[in-house]
Amino acid sequence: DVDGDGDPDFIGARYKPGLVAWFERPENPLKDEWKMRIADDELIGIHGVLKADVDGDGKLDLLANSGQPTGKFPNSAAWLKVPENPREAKRWKRFIFADKDAPGLSHYLGFGDLNGDGRVDLTLAAKGFPDPKFGKGEWFAWWEAGKDPTKPFKKHLLPGIHPGATNIQPADLNGDGKLDVVASRGHGKGLLWFE
């Protein structure tokens, strides 16, 4: 529910040229047109968007990667704050949390408080480009949120080399009350978890 009117809207993204947009649910969602509004058009190489309350204000924000090595935000990832009036906003406010430190064709995002400090940390994976000069990838990482979520976060690589690294999600897999990380190596490469 992007606009706060009580019904669900849709969020979508385009890879290249990059675009994050939301579609406002009409009165009759089966017959009427869903109006598209742009949230961001400067992130390039978006593989997915995810909603999370990054800044702790009780409202959902959007996460998106900028996985291409070119453009205004190369090899980066961002979160977008939903404006007070999303119907009227030309673009949403963008905060880069991974500032040029996510090379290698980053893919999907996750979130959770990985270090137990009460702040939302963010996760990301990169599978690698066919041409390694653009970034070898093959990593899983998490970005530690600081006191000010509008500033870049601190990157922590998880151990190992991970061909096909695509999905990464925090979850308490062993039931000890602490978040672990489950991660997939796409294209038949496997599934693993980090404690």
Question: Over which residues does each language-model region extend?
Answer:
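Beta-propeller-forming repeat regions
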Residues: 1-195
